[in-house]
């Protein structure tokens, strides 16, 4: 295992703010094993994503912000983000630990010729999010759809600004049709980031799951007892009882909300720990750690 080469308390070294999934992919693709960055989630404002170069690919792990001001990744909870990073300095996510943060500006992939570092004005750019569709009325206008992110080029008038879209097209936009996006400071405290977590929303199934570090329960309390095998959904319906409440992010339409005591019909057991199931006609994904499989041999344990 390579030794970690970063200070987890130096937030400016690893926190990149509201960069998109695609930008994180670009920064980490082809980089050395264990290089990582932490960014704002574009799907759930207030959450984070840990993006890591591992096993010749880039994996993205969702970090949920809990109401008690703690942070959760997989089945692990932490008091703060530096503690989470310290944990994964010595524990594998999938095939790697965290070794070093990605440079704040992308480096060429390993094996390519390095280009000289050029100054960039990225941090000085002003971004806006479009609130409505705008078809454009004149040739000089910049048409857009609701939800696009634009870069402001110039403000020649109070109600009309010059902007550039992701395709590089420049034109005039009506100011009442957009809202400003304020880039968060690398040293800023965790707070309301609804207005700056921009980028293309990421579907829940696109996130990887870190290895579980919690040992599976034994059949009995005696040491060395055999592990209870999971039933197969191919042999008929599998039912489980929710043992933990789950309130998914409102933006995640694939997640299944759970109340303690809910009976879940498990339809698929994915190896990444995100199971698929149904409760009262509602279908979706949920972590397997939130439920307990019914044991037909011990009905009393289902209570």
UniProtKB/Swiss-Prot annotation:
Modified residues (Phosphotyrosine): 127, 207
Signal peptide: none
Cited PROSITE patterns: SH2, SH3
Gene Ontology, cellular component aspect: cytoplasm; cytosol; extrinsic component of postsynaptic membrane; neuromuscular junction; nucleoplasm; protein-containing complex
Annotated keywords: Phosphoprotein, Repeat, SH2 domain, SH3 domain
The SH2 domain, residue ranges: 14-102
Coiled coil feature spans: none
Subunit structure: Interacts with tyrosine-phosphorylated EPOR and INPP5D/SHIP1. Interacts with DOCK2 and DOCK5 via its first SH3 domain. Interacts with phosphorylated CBLB and IRS4. Interacts with BCAR1/CAS and NEDD9/HEF1.
Similarity-based family: Belongs to the CRK family.
Function: May mediate the transduction of intracellular signals.
Name recorded for this polypeptide: Crk-like protein
Organism: Homo sapiens (Human)
Lineage: Eukaryota, Metazoa, Chordata, Craniata, Vertebrata
């Amino acid at each position: 295992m390579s030794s970690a080469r970063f200070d987890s308390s130096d937030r400016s070294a690893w926190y990149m703010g509201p960069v998109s999934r695609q930008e994180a992919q670009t920064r980490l693709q082809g980089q050395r094993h264990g290089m990582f960055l932490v960014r704002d989630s574009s799907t759930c404002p207030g959450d984070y994503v840990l993006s890591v170069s591992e096993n010749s690919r880039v994996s993205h792990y969702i970090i949920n912000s809990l109401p008690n001001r703690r942070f959760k990744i997989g089945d692990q909870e932490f008091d703060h983000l530096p503690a989470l990073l310290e944990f994964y300095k010595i524990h594998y996510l999938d095939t790697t630990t965290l070794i070093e943060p990605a440079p704040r500006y992308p480096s060429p992939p390993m094996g390519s010729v390095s280009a000289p570092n050029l100054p960039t004005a990225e941090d000085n750019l002003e971004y806006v999010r479009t609130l409505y569709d705008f078809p454009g009325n004149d040739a000089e206008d910049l048409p857009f759809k609701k939800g696009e992110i634009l870069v402001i080029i110039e403000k020649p008038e109070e109600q009309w600004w010059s902007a550039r879209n992701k395709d590089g097209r420049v034109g005039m936009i009506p100011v009442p049709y957009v809202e400003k996006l304020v880039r968060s400071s690398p040293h800023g405290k965790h707070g309301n980031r609804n207005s700056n977590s921009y980028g293309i929303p990421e579907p829940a199934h696109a996130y990887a799951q870190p290895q579980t570090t919690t040992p599976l329960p034994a059949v009995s309390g005696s040491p060395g007892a055999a592990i209870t095998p999971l039933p197969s959904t191919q042999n008929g319906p599998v039912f489980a009882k929710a043992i933990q409440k789950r309130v998914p992010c409102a933006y995640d339409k694939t997640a299944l909300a759970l109340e303690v005591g809910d009976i879940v019909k498990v339809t698929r057991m994915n190896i990444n720990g995100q199971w698929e199931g149904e409760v009262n006609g509602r279908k979706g994904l949920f972590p397997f750690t939130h439920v307990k499989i019914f044991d037909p041999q011990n009905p009393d344990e289902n209570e």
